């Protein structure tokens, strides 16, 4: 009886692990500057802000894509160190 409970608990853990979404690690992208913060993926950068940089989603950062398809938008990155 206790072995059945152990098997059931193991199955529940495996199902929970299978359903968990993997967290995207942006450090894996060489073009992503970790000194930048991504504010929003669906707005263009404010041209009045000198510290904001627009980066294209396609090719540089895989942010704001749906199933790997590029929406043609830009992401707004703000350099935390004021460069």
UniProtKB/Swiss-Prot annotation:
Signal peptide region: 1-20
Keywords linked to the UniProt accession: Amidation, Cleavage on pair of basic residues, Disulfide bond, Nematocyst, Neurotoxin, Secreted, Signal, Toxin
Residues modified as Phenylalanine amide: 81
Highest taxon in the source lineage: Eukaryota
Keyword Transferase: no
UniProt-annotated location(s): Secreted; Nematocyst
GO cellular component term of the entry, any: extracellular region
Example GO molecular function: toxin activity
Propeptide segment residues: 21-44
Post-translational modification remark: Contains 3 disulfide bonds.
Function: In vivo, induces immediate paralysis on shrimps (C.multidentata), followed by death when high doses are injected. No activity is observed when injected into fly larvae (M.domestica).
Protein name: Toxin CjTL8
Source organism of the structure: Epiactis japonica
């Amino acid at each position: 009886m206790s072995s059945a409970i152990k098997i059931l608990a193991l199955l529940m853990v495996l199902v929970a692990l299978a359903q968990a979404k993997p967290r995207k690690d942006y450090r894996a992208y060489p073009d992503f500057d970790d000194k930048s913060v991504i504010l929003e993926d669906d707005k263009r950068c404010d041209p009045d802000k000198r510290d904001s940089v627009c980066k294209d989603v396609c090719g540089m950062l895989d942010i704001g894509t749906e199933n790997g398809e590029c929406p043609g938008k830009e992401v707004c990155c703000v350099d935390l160190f004021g460069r």
